[in-house]
Design a protein with these regions (language model features):
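A short glycine-rich, Lys/Arg-flanked "PGG" loop and its adjoining helix->strand segment in the class I
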Residues: 177-192
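Conserved S-adenosyl-L-methionine
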Residues: 71-73, 98
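Glycine-rich SAM-binding Motif I of class I
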Residues: 75-79
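Core SAM-dependent methyltransferase catalytic element
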Residues: 212-235
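Short SAM/SAH-binding signature in class I
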Residues: 145-147, 160-168
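Conserved beta-strand signature within the Rossmann-like core of class I S-adenosyl-L-methionine
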Residues: 193-200
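S-adenosyl-L-methionine
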Residues: 108-157
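Rossmann-like AdoMet
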Residues: 2-65, 83-116
Length: 235
């Protein structure tokens, strides 16, 4: 039943009106007015990505590392992770899952390379979005990217990933994406001692994580959000 609910909600998402907005740190994101929901925090898309996924996720690991992103979206998290790979000379195998890819014209409205002062890597951001879906692309010697076009409930990986960026739409608009069914799949996908990070901090989300076996800790959230979760697959 949960899987049918996810598909139904995602079909609705495909039809929802979308607009590009500028967040408080100057970086852009996509907003769904009917849901009052954004792809990233309105308080700062780049600030949120760096705080949640880099500072509290990627920084825990040395190379090589395998990452699963739940909600590839605009590609911001992948791009920032690529920049970190270059900075640290860290080899990263990155998999981004997205049921409904962002349109090409929307991608043109994303100003991440400029806001990150990384215009020399703007071609990398473009390369990520031009790469074929469901095929592994060697973005550079350090960074490979596989964009998988699938629903989250269709994920059936087993102990492949070191780190998961859980960046689905919020519980308020898509609670089915934060269920025990989905988190069981996340737990199964992680290697022993793997880590999942997310911007979320609702009690119901924490309970779902704990129910499937995660050890969960609450951390200080990004600007505009008091708290966030980091979960470990401890063995």
């Amino acid at each position: 039943m949960a899987s049918k609910s996810i598909k139904s909600h995602c079909k609705i998402l495909k039809k929802v009106k979308r607009e590009i907005i500028k967040t408080l740190d100057g970086s852009t994101t996509i907003r769904l007015p009917e849901w009052d929901e954004c792809y990233h925090s309105k308080h700062g898309a780049i600030q949120e990505a760096k705080h949640v996924f880099i500072k509290n996720g990627l920084s825990l690991f040395e190379n090589p590392i395998s990452i699963l992103e739940i909600g590839f979206g605009t590609g911001l998290n992948a791009f920032i992770t690529y920049l970190e790979a270059v900075r640290k000379n860290q080899k990263i195998d990155y998999v981004g899952v997205e049921a409904y890819p962002v349109d090409a014209d929307e991608i043109l409205g994303m100003n991440y390379a400029a806001e990150l002062e990384a215009l020399e890597f703007e071609n990398i951001f473009e390369k990520m979005h031009k790469s074929e879906w469901n095929e592994k692309a060697e973005i550079s010697d350090l960074f490979s990217l596989t964009k998988r076009k699938q629903f989250f409930h269709e994920i059936n990986d087993f102990e492949i990933f070191d780190l998961i960026y859980f960046d689905a739409f919020g519980y308020r608009v898509q609670p089915e994406l934060w269920s025990t069914e989905i988190f069981q799949k996340m737990y199964n996908s992680l290697k022993p001692n793997g880590v999942l990070v997310t911007y979320a901090a609702r009690g119901v989300v924490k309970r779902s994580m704990i129910e499937v076996g995660f050890t969960v800790e609450k951390l200080t959230g990004p600007p505009g959000k008091r708290e966030m979760f980091r979960a470990f697959k401890k063995v």
